[in-house]
Amino acid sequence: MDTRNVIAAISLSAAVIILYSLFFQPDPATIKKNLAEQNKIENNEDTPSLDKNENFSKLSRADALKENDRIQFENGSVVGSISLKGAAIDDLTFKEYNIELNRNEKITLLSPRNVEDGYLIESGFVSTNKNIDIPDASTVWEVSGNNKLTNNNPVKLTWSNTQGITFEKHISLDDQFLFTVKEKIINSSDKSYNFYSYGQIIRNELPEISGFYILHEGFLSVLDDELIEEDYDDIQDKKFTQIAQDGFVAISDKFWVTSVIPPKGKEFKTTFDYKNKFRANYISTKGIEVKANSSIEEKIQIIVAAKRVNVIDGYAENLNINKFDLAIDWGFMYFITKPLFFVLDYFFKLLGNYGLAIIAVTICIRLAFFPLANFSFKSMGKMKLLAPEMARLKELHKDDKMKLQQAMMALYKKEKVNPMSGCLPILVQIPVFFALYKVLFVTIEMRHMPFYGWIHDLSDRDPTSLFNVFGLIPWDPPSFLLIGAWPIIMGITMWIQQKLNPTPPDPIQAKIFMFFPVFLTVILAPFPAGLVIYWSFNNIFTMIQQYIVQRKMTIKTT
């Protein structure tokens, strides 16, 4: 990559982002209208509240799991249990994912509500009728029949109040991450009652988050085709509420998602809030009347999943969950990022290694931009051939910058050379570069995937460091000194590439460009190793192409 073109292209990209934010922000009238609608929804007294006074003494996770009777569940992807007290899904571990690369300890996502970092899902009914007993977090349910939940064996929970009403939960589990809960009310009394169905995700504490601006971690919903993303700190300041008829409610981590999907075609109110714990929930806005000696049933779906692309896309399609694929944060360049993942995944299946797949994608990108790059290199080759004449003009007009600039422009016009022509191929490639960064950062498929040699995780930084001679000295340098072998390889290839480009006439500019490979080496050191490998091989392929083009031009001129 021509360093000057990289700087120019990045500047142009920044300008586009700034202009977009200036001209496409919602107007104040729209914001005011949305706030008015928000207040109207929040002050709606027709829908019962999910606020409850719950006081639980905090226990260790092990003790909390022993405190109440539980139904165990297991399939090929998850293992855990459902507490009979409250009937919440509050214990779930992913069987296929380790916490760290070389440790066998598995990722545990859900924990009981009386654990410090409790994280759980609950569902059921509430009512505006204060005289009726309804199951809550303290209710102890009874198991009817099978007492272990698997993908082949559903379970049934029941609880009856003293007013002649029985509540049932029929829970099933597929072979991956989907729980289906059929909530049933059987009214054996001589009175009619109204109930509102709900689903709720509760998280006691702020989790450890990545903190990168390119990744959303927090509250997530698609409501009537609108994507809603709210950060934890925003919800701590002000709750979010919106009414919709279609969508899902979720809390999203980098690689995991916990979501509840309301019944189809029924209006519901979604709320994100914080009252000593984070809550994401929905509640139906219209009561369901259960007449005397009758019954009703509502079905909700709960997905607690690792964000594997084929799994998330499969649920989105098979369950008809609108835009559920956005549970993976593909970003605003969705139209590039997601297809790029599929290309990478294709080469992975073909070559058996994501590092090799990245190199294959690099070659494909070079081939796709070959005509643009050729045009750029020919222009730079002409610039290099004009270097002696440019040096002569510089010496001739060294005391008059205006005349020097005019002479240079006349030379460019005469020789039909555009010094900025190299910008276009670089500018086109910048979205691809950021899209690849996004893919490496957010897709669980890249997690703990090795390359050859010392790279054991392409989604993480190069673990080696120049400052301990790549592990030869028994010293662990601080993170800001972790400049690994691949970032250095990238810097060297960029420096060699610079030598193929014409030297800038301005000595200060020349020094800046000479320092740029060192600067970029330091900047890219903490980036995912896969991205640095991409940039390194892109430099190598660019140098080869540039050398061939310039050699042909030299032969033609001699």
UniProtKB/Swiss-Prot annotation:
It holds the Pfam family 60KD_IMP. InterPro entries: Membr_insert_YidC, Membr_insert_YidC_N, YidC/ALB3/OXA1/COX18, YidC/Oxa/ALB_C, YidC_ALB_C, YidC_periplasmic_sf. One of its GO terms (cellular component) is plasma membrane. One of its GO terms (biological process) is protein transport. It is a multi-pass membrane protein. Gene3D superfamilies: 2.70.98.90. The keyword Mitochondrion does not apply. GO terms for molecular function: membrane insertase activity. CDD domains: 5TM_YidC_Alb3, EcYidC-like_peri. It is found in: Cell inner membrane. The chain crosses the membrane at residues 6-26, 326-348, 355-377, 424-444, 469-489, 512-532. Keywords: Cell inner membrane, Cell membrane, Chaperone, Membrane, Protein transport, Transmembrane, Transmembrane helix, Transport. Required for the insertion and/or proper folding and/or complex formation of integral membrane proteins into the membrane. Involved in integration of membrane proteins that insert both dependently and independently of the Sec translocase complex, as well as at least some lipoproteins. Aids folding of multispanning membrane proteins. NCBIfam families: PRK01318.1-4, yidC_nterm, yidC_oxa1_cterm. HAMAP family: YidC_type1. Interacts with the Sec translocase complex via SecD. Specifically interacts with transmembrane segments of nascent integral membrane proteins during membrane integration. This is Membrane protein insertase YidC. It comes from Pelagibacter ubique (strain HTCC1062). The gene is yidC.
